[in-house]
């Protein structure tokens, strides 16, 4: 019998490119190793916590991935899993193309900023952030990519099918070559947009934090250029 809750911690490795000790391949490596671990592969950087190695849970079909500032509202996990399990959304992986060609291995819900109120909010958040909170009259949003091409853009916070996601991304990316992995993963694993399910996240508290985040995103997008033009 496995535990209901697991604490997984990865050991740090020295990265010559970054000149620092860090988790292998950051968040992309974390998900890659998690998928391998869930399928029984022992060769990962996950460490024993408290002297006991975590027991691998059996039969895990989906993984919901969130950032530290992301909030999962009540019943959202049930809605995400139910939508993934719908027969029309089930992913079909093509071994020849090495990607998902039908259905979706990833579903991206709508990301809504927290309401910038309370003692922790700032004037910058109230001025710059978009409309926050729950819209009681809102319905599913329209999205150009989803409406025209039946695919959405993965933003790194959502649910994915472990088997299809791992098969589509296996051996695709060399080390130290990709910072913004979300869009890349959404292309090969085929992401769908689920706009009638909300996740909430905190907007940057000041301009400096927001600028650093935007700079990181732009750097990551430029690193996708070799795959766009066919160099990779």
PLM regions and their residue ranges:
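Internal catalytic domains of large membrane-associated glycosyltransferases
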Residues: 1-232
